[in-house]
């Protein structure tokens, strides 16, 4: 079962059509992008599923929100992080709000690059942040459970991805490995 939410765009129309394999690929990509992002900052997180997942996730201190688009879809990614996990990953000592925005930006970058390597291209917008306490009720919907993680010290990370399909999705043959930058590469243009 996918933890990424796919739905039809508001208005009349058919149910969302996602090409075979793309839904599970997006779900796996969403999970691996989070694990790899926090590993880059020496914080190990592991997925939480089934009865271990408690909603709402009680200790999220800040959320970074990023909108993204592609032909045929519009989506939102929300990255929520507990105070302890957020601060353990922040080696530069910036504010929690700035750091969760940076993590959300890096998360969507990793997510996009992984999908691009599979032939699916997304464009993202600048992240915004919100205090976790402001969204406690909005993110506790039982039918909108996050991709949830715990770190070794009990901290939490949660990722919600919602995708509205409003037309045919375009998946192209993947570019060659050398054409797509790796996570963390510096790109000058």
Placement of each model-derived feature along the sequence:
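N-terminal auxiliary interaction/assembly segments of multi-subunit proteins
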Residues: 1-189
């Amino acid at each position: 079962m996918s933890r990424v939410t796919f739905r039809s765009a508001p208005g009349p129309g058919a149910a969302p059509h996602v090409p075979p394999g793309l839904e599970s690929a997006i779900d796996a990509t969403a999970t691996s992008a989070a694990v790899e992002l926090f590993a880059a900052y020496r914080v190990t997180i592991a997925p939480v599923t089934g009865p271990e997942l408690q909603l709402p996730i009680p200790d999220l201190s800040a959320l970074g929100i990023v909108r993204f688009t592609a032909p045929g879809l519009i989506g939102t990614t929300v990255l929520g992080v507990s105070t302890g996990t957020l601060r353990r990953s922040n080696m530069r000592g910036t504010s929690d709000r700035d750091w969760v925005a940076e993590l959300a930006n890096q998360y969507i970058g990793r997510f996009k690059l992984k999908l691009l390597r599979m032939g699916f291209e997304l464009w993202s917008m600048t992240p915004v942040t919100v205090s976790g306490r402001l969204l406690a009720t909005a993110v506790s919907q039982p039918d909108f459970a996050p991709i949830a993680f715990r770190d070794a010290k009990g901290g939490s990370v949660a990722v919600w991805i919602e995708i509205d399909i409003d037309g045919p999705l375009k998946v192209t043959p993947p570019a060659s490995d050398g054409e797509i930058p790796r996570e963390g590469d510096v790109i000058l243009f």
